[in-house]
Amino acid sequence: METQIKKYQELNDFALKNGVVLFGEGIDTDIPASELAQSFELDYPVYNRSFLGLNLENSIALYDSCIKNLMPDTVLLHIGASHLDFFNENKVAFEQKYISLIEHIKTMNKKCRIVVVSIDNKTINQELKYIADSTKCEFVDISSIKVWNPQATKNVTTFVQTMGVRKYCNRKPIYDILKILFTY
């Protein structure tokens, strides 16, 4: 994990601030966020700062080491898939640690939009939704976006933009970003 931390810290020296950051675990580390943002011609940076071995115990330290200095506009939290045993053993501790992470992010960056992203477990997703609601964050269930056709959407978006149509949006379109990241 130390190698990954060092890599992210070096990348952060060149990274733009005020973007979208995916903070996930496991296979999330393989999502090429910046390349997908470039391919879909997003006009804001999207970074993947996910870790193998990320858990609720080390999440705050990893956030501080690799994300805090990016001053992200939005953080996508995709944490919980590897926590089923912990959740089953102590649901209250799971909830407290997740809420502590969210509160820490809000303390470090008061303007940061935090999105709790669903995992592939209905029981934990119910808890994640509760956590998101109780901390005034967004919860997005990505299970319904698995059938999305990214190439078709990219073609339509490109066509609409070449026609001169620009949509007004004062925040980054989270649902679209999640579709891009989790269905590539």
Please report, for each region that a protein language model flagged, where it lies by residue:
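Serine-esterase "nucleophile elbow" of acetyl-processing enzymes
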Residues: 1-52, 57, 63-71
